Amino acid sequence: MIDFGNFYSLIAKNHLSHWLETLPAQIASWQREQQHGLFKQWSNAVEFLPEIKPYRLDLLHSVTAESEEPLSAGQIKRIETLMRNLMPWRKGPFSLYGVNIDTEWRSDWKWDRVLPHLSDLTGRTILDVGCGSGYHMWRMIGAGAHLAVGIDPTQLFLCQFEAVRKLLGNDQRAHLLPLGIEQLPALKAFDTVFSMGVLYHRRSPLEHLWQLKDQLVNEGELVLETLIIDGDENTVLVPGDRYAQMRNVYFIPSALALKNWLKKCGFVDIRIADVSVTTTEEQRRTEWMVTESLSDFLDPHDPGKTVEGYPAPKRAVLIARKP
């Protein structure tokens, strides 16, 4: 069973202590009532993983752990089998004692695009909204963050995160909670808040921006990464039934429209840091994620369009400050 006690003990001693007024009851309710039917199977995979203290740990350039002496073929096979029980792996990659988890997304490429535009993360307390398996949280720690807290209600991601954490020597500098942002009080406690790949899934994108702002300290930094389309400050795509085969895509603004949304929500110093077309090299099927991926969602005769005829995925990173 996944235990959140270490996190409670950690925040009891810092400026997040007021979160303890609501968080333990929320987690207890989730443990009683909301667990996925496969959660026991996934958590067993985590439990059966060996506890290893890495001799070499690299979170700055990748998420890589190595032992002083190479593991035996049997040990490597055991780790690989247990990690495969947690498929599909969408966000990564991870290199753990000779087991290379080639995830659907090259999340390291996104991090390389984002990192040069961030304020120095050294010593910061960070919230990662919709953090997936937690890959970017480990990279935040590698960049000097004091604490990275991720929230994501997808329970497979929680188990993937806990599996990686165990293989990183039970590292307590990052924590994942199975919650959505709407379940968080206005903590106003994080130096940097990341929301990457979330906004277009929200029925009310401006409400999401307000929720992000409510988590930031004054002068805190928002890092927003989302789908965009080309156009002026009034351009917003509202897809029909699906976009790139996803049903839960509601609003895709232009980067300029998104700047206006952020301004309307009270953010300042707003800048478009990066715009990139998503390629089939960055998002693709692998042996760790064997179902459909981006190439299946694009028009086979025109890769500049989705199968529905919309512009193919393009993403922007915007940076803003809460005054």
Swiss-Prot record:
Binding-site residues, carboxy-S-adenosyl-L-methionine: 91, 105, 110, 130, 152-154, 181-182, 196, 200, 315
Claim: tRNA processing is one of the keywords in the record: yes
UniProt entry tagged with the keyword Lipid biosynthesis: no
> GO terms for biological process?
tRNA wobble uridine modification
- Disulfide bond sites: none
Entry EC number(s): 2.5.1.-
For this protein, the record's CDD domains field holds: AdoMet_MTases (cd02440)
Kindly state which keywords UniProt assigns to this record, in alphabetical order. Answer: Transferase, tRNA processing
Q: Please name the InterPro entries in this protein's record.
A: CmoB (IPR010017), Mo5U34_MeTrfas-like (IPR027555), SAM-dependent_MTases_sf (IPR029063)
Family annotation (SUPFAM superfamilies): S-adenosyl-L-methionine-dependent methyltransferases
Broad enzyme group = transferase
Catalysed transformations (reactions):
carboxy-S-adenosyl-L-methionine + 5-hydroxyuridine(34) in tRNA = 5-carboxymethoxyuridine(34) in tRNA + S-adenosyl-L-homocysteine + H(+)
Q: Which GO terms describe its molecular function?
A: methyltransferase activity; transferase activity, transferring alkyl or aryl (other than methyl) groups
Q: How does it assemble?
A: Homotetramer.
List the HAMAP family: tRNA_carboxymethyltr_CmoB (MF_01590)
Looking up NCBIfam families in the UniProt record yields: PRK15068.1, tRNA 5-methoxyuridine(34)/uridine 5-oxyacetic acid(34) synthase CmoB
Q: What does this protein do?
A: Catalyzes carboxymethyl transfer from carboxy-S-adenosyl-L-methionine (Cx-SAM) to 5-hydroxyuridine (ho5U) to form 5-carboxymethoxyuridine (cmo5U) at position 34 in tRNAs.
Q: What family classification does the UniProt entry report for this protein?
A: Belongs to the class I-like SAM-binding methyltransferase superfamily. CmoB family.
Entry-linked PANTHER family? METHYLTRANSFERASE (PTHR43464), TRNA U34 CARBOXYMETHYLTRANSFERASE (PTHR43464:SF95)
The name this protein goes by in its record:
tRNA U34 carboxymethyltransferase
Species the sequence originates in: Escherichia fergusonii (strain ATCC 35469 / DSM 13698 / CCUG 18766 / IAM 14443 / JCM 21226 / LMG 7866 / NBRC 102419 / NCTC 12128 / CDC 0568-73)
Primary gene name: cmoB
